Amino acid sequence: MDDNPALLDSRAELSEFLRTRRARLQPHDVGLPDFGRHRRVPGLRREELAQLAGVSVAYYTRLEQGNGRNVSGEVLDAIARALRLTDAEHAHLTRLAKPKALKKKRAARQQHMRPALQQLLDSIQTVPAYVVGRRTDILGWNALAAALFGDWGELAPADRNWARICFLDPRSRDVFVNWEQKASDIVSYLRMDAGCYPNDPELSSLVGELSVKSEEFRGLWATHDVREKGHGVKHLHHPLVGDLTLSFETLRLPDDCDQSLLMYHAEPDSASAQGLRLLASWGRDASAVGSPQK
């Protein structure tokens, strides 16, 4: 018996994903007239979405009810275009609609980071860097990442996880100035993993734990948002060096598509660059978050 059927039921996942994507669109977003009529529920009607996708209302209704059996790639592409899905959302829709094909190709496996990758991380001394895997598990890091975010080596392996740190460690709210965005990103990554590995027991357990312990996680999980890890800017606060504005890049590792290398850097000659230099000189004693509570 599955402990968390909501995560593993691909039909329910497909239904909710399509419904939430449809609800976020208004007629004017897709060039349809609205005529000022009041809508009992937000977003496009099913018949409007079916019209945009070029399928019958009955067919789309069956799909939104979770019946994706034998749906063609062309139809999924048309629905993705009608829903204005991002590339990440389009890929997620395909995985949800064709879970049997996915099951044949993927099975959740034990995560290991190659020793050479840790050696590479150790050689990176001027910017924080770490490797993250499925479920937002933190697999390896360098000394400056430990000084910035916390010495994850002091945590139990199961707790070296961004989702647990973000939602269960209150110090993360002090470190991430825009904590809400960080939390939303993390949940969207977990949603992507759930689409790729719907039968991963560790992912199911993680989602179940966070759903019980965090109301904020439950609310974000219900949005069904999905995003790929990418690049951007993070505003952080460190108790010793103050505010930091750091750009980050995510590099997908070629021999394991589930693992990514993340590196943070500051603008040259900025206050943030000076802050990183101070952290590098102080080392792990400067840890801010992610270490066990004292």
Model-identified regions with their sequence ranges:
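Amphipathic, well-packed alpha-helical segments that form the structural scaffold of globular domains
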Residues: 19-26, 94, 98, 122, ...
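A short, Lys/Arg-rich alpha-helix, primarily the initiator
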Residues: 1-44
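Recognition helix of helix-turn-helix/homeodomain-like DNA-binding domains
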Residues: 35-40, 46-47, 53-70, 80
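Short amphipathic recognition helices of helix-turn-helix/homeodomain-type DNA-binding modules
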Residues: 2-19, 71-77, 81-112
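An N-terminal domain-cap segment
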Residues: 29-43, 102-118, 122-123
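Hydrophobic protein-protein interaction segments
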Residues: 115-294
